[in-house]
């Protein structure tokens, strides 16, 4: 009788569940995965090399395009590394704004993850639900920076500008009558902080809706329970961070263990899993959304009560205000010099890490005293997570490999860099 051999299957890079450009070479025995070999590099854009030829401030927009669903969290790590080298202090109001927008970014990321992961596993309904809330979060980005995604809002020493007093309004159009527009603009009459405050009150009910759709859903549990189990010891040895590590039961969160900016001034809990399977990681991320909402609410209350500067008063680093730049020649020259020549950073090296929605996102910066980085190294959380795929998928079915890729929350912008 003929012996049946294992065969290879190419999964991606055009597969809808490959989350971008993942090429996975699977070695299969029937339908069971024996080996999974991820091939990366299809989205390599040489970000680290490009940063060596741009001034510190010119490299900032590249950070938005690394993990392009967690834009401001990437900027956060980059700004912290520069501030460490410069030895400058960030005003407290700017710290709170950064924390608030980092958590808004976490919601954006987790909603994107939940919608696409649910869709991969066969629940297309959840995708529509999560994108409904993302729309409001994008409006917050737009109000503060003018861009809905790649904001470049965080700056070394603080943030680009203070929070606006008004929100962008929906305009009348052929598809919506005046009454519909009025309903849409109902919670946009006040300032940005009022809009965010309104969102924080509505959002817990939205999370309840997601949980109604998935948490006790029989099919969802069949697709995620006991799939891709990682023990706490293996999770540490494999270099997992963020929800992947917390899903295995280890309460490690940089916001608590190594607080940066105003994280030591806000209250929140660290959700952890028990089993370390895909279902636990789902529960951890859903609970994280509730905690992020709690942090945002605390930031809104503090920011409403405490006006103040939003960028450092060190004028070698901070640009002049737009009002003064448009009325004084000296400020215009200052602005021009700062954005063309940049500022010089003292010789040395610094590593700054943030609790990114996907894990520990770190920037290692080496300066030789010039206005450009001598070397910039990006520590992407997804890179270590993708390397664990072989171990997690072995012995599971092909369909489970899709659920495991989904649970990792992979974005190739940061992995290929």
UniProtKB/Swiss-Prot annotation:
It catalyses: a quinone + NADH + 5 H(+)(in) = a quinol + NAD(+) + 4 H(+)(out). It is an enzyme of class 7 (translocase). InterPro entries: NADH_Q_OxRdtase_suD (IPR001135), NADH_UbQ_OxRdtase_49kDa_CS (IPR014029), NDH1_su_D/H (IPR022885), NiFe-Hase_large (IPR029014). It is found in: Cell inner membrane. Pfam families: Complex1_49kDa. The keyword Membrane applies. GO terms for cellular component: plasma membrane. Its EC number is 7.1.1.-. NCBIfam families: NuoD, PRK06075.1. HAMAP family: NDH1_NuoD. NDH-1 shuttles electrons from NADH, via FMN and iron-sulfur (Fe-S) centers, to quinones in the respiratory chain. The immediate electron acceptor for the enzyme in this species is believed to be ubiquinone. Couples the redox reaction to proton translocation (for every two electrons transferred, four hydrogen ions are translocated across the cytoplasmic membrane), and thus conserves the redox energy in a proton gradient. NDH-1 is composed of 14 different subunits. Subunits NuoB, C, D, E, F, and G constitute the peripheral sector of the complex. This is NADH-quinone oxidoreductase subunit D.
